[in-house]
A protein has these predicted regions:
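Helix-loop-helix module between adjacent transmembrane segments
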Residues: 39-44, 82, 115-140, 149-186, ...
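N-terminal amphipathic/hydrophobic targeting modules at extreme N-termini
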Residues: 464-480, 561, 567-568, 573-576
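Extracellular/periplasmic helix-exit of transmembrane alpha-helices
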Residues: 123-135, 241-257, 270-271, 301-304, ...
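Flexible loop linkers connecting adjacent transmembrane helices
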Residues: 49-74, 96, 102-106, 118-160, ...
Length: 578
């Protein structure tokens, strides 16, 4: 009964919704494909081709260090999100795409990545902006559930304990990650059975035991990934690159096959052109997670002074995942003769291709690599899950541990299930997550896009920062609602245009301030006593070193909603609330 429900929801999300007849070609598109392509095109145009225009900024953002000691660094957030992207998506996801969609699916995975990079930028920027303190694990937490909650509060005009849309996203995420847990154990057990003739039950139980040792501890998750992901991704990339370089004469033929099947010039699968497009986009989403709302959970955990930087980091992760690593996997399989991989699916297909290229070592190499990739994926999705568990149940170690135990149980179940069944649950979960995530991305995207517009000046300013004497610590003051009410909202030392300002409501007056600095200061930075436009409301802010000395230290932000403030100047008058 449960399997029938899962399959029914799967057909609703990923089944044919729109059929287009283009000459001799029939294109059938699902609801999810239409949703993702529309969002990708919209955000790519709105960000003015962000993957190309700001590629240098993406690399610079990854290299920044976290000197504050709390939260994750930019590199760590990239590692966590890459752990889940590179883990299952680049091996199992690509294999699934080629098994059903043929070589043309690779092209549509590339399209999904190029369009999805802008979507990932928007959702990760919003996640960083609306993050909250993590009282259980320390640092920060956030994600779509949290900015969906903020959006609901704005529409209702009052504080809410829970938002229906946010709860639905959180539940969808937990369902999705249970499904991915099954895919993890199913793929690893199949690979080890082919490589070492180990029964699936034995592999599954050993994998579950090793996972339990790590995930049931409090702080081992990210530290484990810091070491595991760069090493395993590097080894896999070098090995596949060597295979590609030794088959360079065949590479043009592979590209011809990819593009001809992708554009419907050659039919290679039973479902025709529509199957190629749908499976390429579906597995592209599973691989790079753009738009699904998974990666923002990692982006929110970063200690970052500018949400735009974290958006750029996650956009780069999408490109690394699909354009680089996924392509390596696809080329390895497509460079093998069709007679080697004909009739195979799942990990059998990839292992057969690797055996052709590397002999028996190739089968063992893929089995071990997949085990490490899958292990990192499982750790990464539990890192995502804890943000959503916290939103649903609050700061509770009991519920955090309960979900970890459930995920471990799903590992065991997945090792015993059929290949298609375990994929359906993951696809249902990721589809529902994407729908609820989009409910917030469109209304809130203006904030991320406004900040994105000032990214270039900020980067140039930061390059010159070392040549300017450091200014004393200062605070931004904002006038809200009442003409003479001033609230300390953020530390203003080296505060650039595009930075996000947020402050708890004043205890006596009940007002809150939040917004994005639109302009101000020399080279985009706020100068002392200079009015600054804040957000769309036109609230003016002013830096006052005198108030900073009285306040003593910056107040903490918590992502409160925008106040109904009217444009007013805070210059001259009032004292800051402390």
């Amino acid at each position: 009964m449960l399997i029938q429900i899962i399959e029914g929801v799967y057909r609703l999300l990923w089944g044919d919704l729109l059929t287009l007849h283009l000459g001799n070609v029939t294109l059938s598109l699902s609801f999810m494909v239409i949703l993702l392509l529309t969002a990708g095109v919209f955000f790519t145009l709105r960000t003015r081709l962000l993957p190309v225009r700001l590629f240098r900024d993406m690399l610079a953002a990854v290299c920044e260090k976290n000197d504050k000691g709390s939260g994750l660094s930019s590199f760590q957030t990239l590692v966590v999100s890459t752990a889940t992207r590179v883990g299952m998506g680049n091996l199992v996801g690509v294999v699934a795409a080629l098994s059903v969609g043929g070589a043309g699916a690779v092209f549509w995975m590339w399209v999904t990545a190029l369009l999805g990079a802008s979507t990932s930028f928007v959702e990760s920027t919003l996640a960083q902006k609306y993050k909250q303190p993590d009282h259980l694990y320390g640092g920060w937490r956030g994600g779509p559930a949290y900015y969906l909650h903020t959006l609901a509060e704005r529409k209702r005009g009052r504080k809410l304990r829970r938002s229906v849309a946010a709860c639905l996203f959180a539940v969808s995420g937990l369902i999705c990650w249970c499904g991915i847990s099954q895919v993890v154990s199913n793929s690893v057990s199949e690979a080890f059975q082919n490589a070492f003739s180990i029964p699936p039950l034995v592999t599954t139980l050993v994998l579950t035991a090793l996972a339990a040792v790590i995930v049931l501890r409090k702080e081992a998750t990210v530290k484990s990934l810091d070491v595991m992901v760069p090493i395993m991704a590097g080894c896999y990339f070098v090995m596949t690159l060597w295979i590609i370089l030794t088959h360079l004469p065949q590479l043009p033929g592979v590209f011809v096959q990819i593009f001809s099947e992708a554009l419907g010039l050659r039919q290679a699968v039973g479902g025709g052109f529509g199957a190629v497009v749908m499976n390429g986009i579906k597995r592209g989403l599973f691989s790079n997670e753009a738009g699904s709302g998974s990666a923002p959970c990692a982006a929110a955990a970063a200690e970052c002074d500018d949400p735009v930087k974290m958006g750029l980091v996650q956009a780069l992760g999408v490109l690394i995942d699909t354009i680089v690593i996924c392509s390596c996997t696809a080329f390895v399989m497509l460079l093998a003769p069709g007679s080697v991989t004909s009739g195979l699916q799942g990990m059998n297909l990839l292992q057969a291709a690797m055996q052709y290229h590397l002999g028996s070592f190739g089968v063992v190499f893929i089995a071990v690599t997949l085990a490490l990739f899958s292990f990192s994926t499982f750790i990464g999705i539990l890192y995502y899950a804890r943000c959503n568990v916290a939103y649903l149940f609050g700061d509770s170690w009991f519920w955090q541990t309960a979900y970890k135990v459930l995920a471990l149980v799903m590992l065991v179940v997945g090792g015993m299930q059929a290949y298609t069944v375990v994929w359906d649950l993951g696809d249902v979960g990721i589809g529902l997550m994407t729908i609820f995530n989009m409910l917030a991305l469109y209304p809130l995207s203006g904030e991320a896009l406004t900040a994105c517009g000032s990214t270039k000046p900020k980067r140039n300013s930061s390059e010159q920062k070392s040549h300017r004497p450091r200014q004393p610590m200062a605070f931004v003051l904002c006038a809200v609602t009442q003409p003479h009410l001033e609230v300390v909202v953020a530390e203003a030392d080296q505060l650039p245009a595009g930075a996000v300002l947020s402050q708890r409501p004043d205890g006596r007056q009940g007002h809150s301030v939040e917004g994005v600095v639109l302009a101000g200061g020399v080279d985009g930075h706020i100068a002392e006593d200079e009015p600054v436009a804040l957000g769309r409301r036109g609230v003016e802010a002013v830096v006052s070193h005198d108030i900073a000395r009285e306040a003593g230290r910056p107040a903490e932000a918590d992502g409160a909603g925008l106040s109904p403030g009217s444009p007013a100047s805070s210059r001259g008058g009032g004292r800051a609330s402390q």
